[in-house]
Structures are given as structure tokens and as C-alpha cells.
Amino acid sequence: AAISKKLEMVGKSYAELVGISKLSYKTLQAMCNFAASHHQDMPKMEYETALVGAQKMGEHLFVRKVNYLAWREIDDTSHLEMATKEILPRIQENESIRQVRREVLLNPGPATTTDSVKYAQVCADICPREEEFGQMMRWICDELTLFIGKKEDYETVLFAGSGTLADEVMVSSCVPQDGKLLIINNGSYGQRLAKIASVYKMDYEVYESSTYEAIDLDALGKKLDEGSYTHLAAVYHETTTGLLNPIPQIGRMCHDRGIVTIIDTVSAFSAIPIDMERDCIDFMASTSNKCIQGMAGVCFVFCNRKELEKLKGEPMRNYYMNLYDQYQYFSKTLQTRFTPPVQILNALRQAIIETKQETIEARYARYTACWNILVDVVKELGLEMLVKKEEQSHLITAILEPQDGKYSFEEFHDLAREQSFTIYPGKLGNINTFRIANIGDIQPHEMEQFAQFMREYFRK
């Protein structure tokens, strides 16, 4: 390689040297020695020439090429004027490309993420079969497990896909051929669990409960006693309405009866503190793009090891989503059976680090602070919430749409979007609502800004 200011001196122009970011003392010594030995011929040697000389003397140089760099050497006022006119706009353009617009997602997920989580996706290309990547996945599984229990008692199994895929993994893998499943349905996501069971033609029944009122635990207990159920499936946080189901109580009721519990914690995990042993949860599903505050594309199933090992040898209802097969293969190889989303897992790793720093308890307190701001403005404006305050999750709030003819959700949504707020509609039977979620990297001052927007919109 050659370094020269004269294009005719080089066979091919690779890049232009505009500065040195790092120079070792050894390289500097080599440059100085070369300059000293040629001082008589070149008393005003330029540093590029000395650098070339150092290279010829055996010093290894490493060049980092920076694409789209806008620069101008400024030696006088004319250079400054030219730089201001021609170069500064290019610099500003390059900077605008790098900036990430701050969007406050008040939809139930994917959630708002930190810039550090976004940038974690910009990583070196790597084959996911490399041991280095396998070790990172092992770290992710272990750290996720530590949020909900002890590693010796619980295991986390990763899949590429959405939270619904994790639900399907659990329902299709955890109930044996001779098992009988009871599914609690009090919203769209409980209904989804039932749909999955029906697709696989499983032996199951559905316990119907109000979509916006607390589950009657006495009635549920009678239902559990009536049938010969081996497993129960339920949703911890019903995202349709923001209703928080009493899973710890339900879990204890099931374990007292020898029933295995399968819980959708897609929009509860990493917000509501969960201890699987304390809360009597055997299997539970979640995803990377909700309260863990990562990017969409990875889901995971938390497993009681004893119950997981009981699945060994069970006939497979499907291939890709088989829980035990995925667990066993990863345990032996530190690889998933099929290609994992490399960049999304890097982002999840960063999200886990940030969750550990904040702690789940502090995160739930932050979410609750944002929810309190929302509840106050809803009351102030005379709007109504679908679910009673004491039965809400503090994470998602379903608000009844006003009957005022001036109200239009589309207009409300579009005006909010102009101010970088994204909101979400919600329909529950014949009840029209809009939903406000306060999960993700949302701060109380941003919820205050949204509250002010609501005041301006509903009082216009």
C-alpha cells in the first residue's frame, strides 16, 4: 500500500487521509527516525511522507475507511466561507441520518426502546453457530431465568418469533396426549390460547370470565374440582383491557389440586415482579419486545425443570415449536435448531443489562408513576376506564370512547402521531375503547406531555 497526495503516484485510490486518530509511540518513533535521516533533503517533511517512510521501515499501519465523511481543511477565510456554504450542510445531513427520532409508543407493544438497545443491533456479522454466539445465548437464557427464579430449578428456552409463538410452544408441547387442559378466557389473549388448543384438536375446556371484571375464584375452584384437568392455561395480564388476573392465587389453587400451570406473561414479565416458585407457575411465555424493552423477534418459555423433563419422549405435535427438542438441542450444542435472529438477540442482551440496572421493581414503579398521570387526566376530562382501578395492571388502560359526535379516533391518533405519540384502538364486543400503554422506555415527563395533549384535544 502507498500513501501519497499525488494521485498519479498510486495505482488505485482507496481513501483520502484526513487525520490520524490513533498513533502508537513506536510508530511515532519510526516516523521521527525517518524524518531525521532525510532532514537534509526534506527539512520540511510532511507527516504523510514520514508515515509512508515508517511503513517502508517495517512499521505496520492500519487504515480505517470512513464513508460519507464531509470535511474541509480550513487555512484562511475563503476556506471557511466555502466550508460553511458547501461542507456544513453535508455534515448536518450526515448527522440527521444518524439521529433516531424519539417516538413514544403508547401501544401495547412493541414498546419504546432506548437508543442503546437500538444501536446494539449494529454489530459485527457472525455465524450463529460460532461458540462465541452460543455463549451469548447461554448468558441471555441464564439472566432471563434469574429474573424469575433459581437457575438450578428453572430454565429459559429461546425461539425466534412473537409472543404468540411462545404461547403455541407451551400449549402444544406441555400438555401430553392424555392430558386435559382448562383455559381461562377473559379477553382476546385467553381466546387465542383456546384457538391454539382447538387447532391441535386437544382435549380442552374453556372457563369463561368477564373481560373487564375480576375472576370469581370460588367459581373457578368449583370448575377445577368438577373436571379431571391436568393442566390450566391463563393470561397474567390481559392486554385487551389492562385487567390483571390473580395468577399467584390461581397457581396455588392449581398446585393444591396437582394441576400444571401454563401462563402467558407476554405483557407482564419484566414489569410485574414474578417468582415462579412462589407464584406456582410451571411454564410461562414472554417476548423481547414488551416490558423487557428489547426489539421484536425473540420469544422465550420459562420452564420448571422437573416439569420440563417430564416432556421427554412425548409425541411431538409439531416440529419447529417443540419445547423439549429445542431445550435438549441447545443444552448439548449451545445452538438453536434453526437460525436465530442475531441482531435481535444482541439487542435483547443490551435490554437485559438495562433491566438489571433499573431492576424490575423500580421499572414497575416507573410504569405506575406514568399510569397515575394517565389516570388523573382521564378523571379530569370526565372520561371512563373500562376496568376498575384496583383490578388494573398499571401497564395498559382501556378508556371508553366518548359518545361526543366530535370525537374521532382517527383524528385523535393522527394528531397524537404528529407529536410523536402512538396510540391504539380497542374493541371488546360492542364496547369501543382506545388503549393507552405505558410500558417500554417511557418517562413520567413524557406521560405528562401526552396528558397535556389529551387536554388540548378533548377540550377543543
Residue ranges, per PLM feature:
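A glycine-/small-polar-enriched, mobile loop at the entrance of the PLP active site in fold-type I
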Residues: 102-159
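PLP-dependent enzyme catalytic core of the Aspartate aminotransferase-like
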Residues: 432-460
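Conserved core of the sugar-phosphate nucleotidyltransferase
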Residues: 1-40
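Active-site phosphate-binding strand-loop segment of PLP-dependent enzymes
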Residues: 215-270, 283
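Active-site C-terminal subdomain of aminotransferase-like
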Residues: 112-113, 289-377
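Conserved beta-loop-alpha segment that forms the PLP phosphate-binding cup at the N-terminus of a helix
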Residues: 153-182, 186, 190-194
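Conserved PLP-binding catalytic core of the aspartate aminotransferase-like
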Residues: 384-415
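Conserved active-site segment immediately N-terminal to the catalytic lysine
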Residues: 277-289, 299
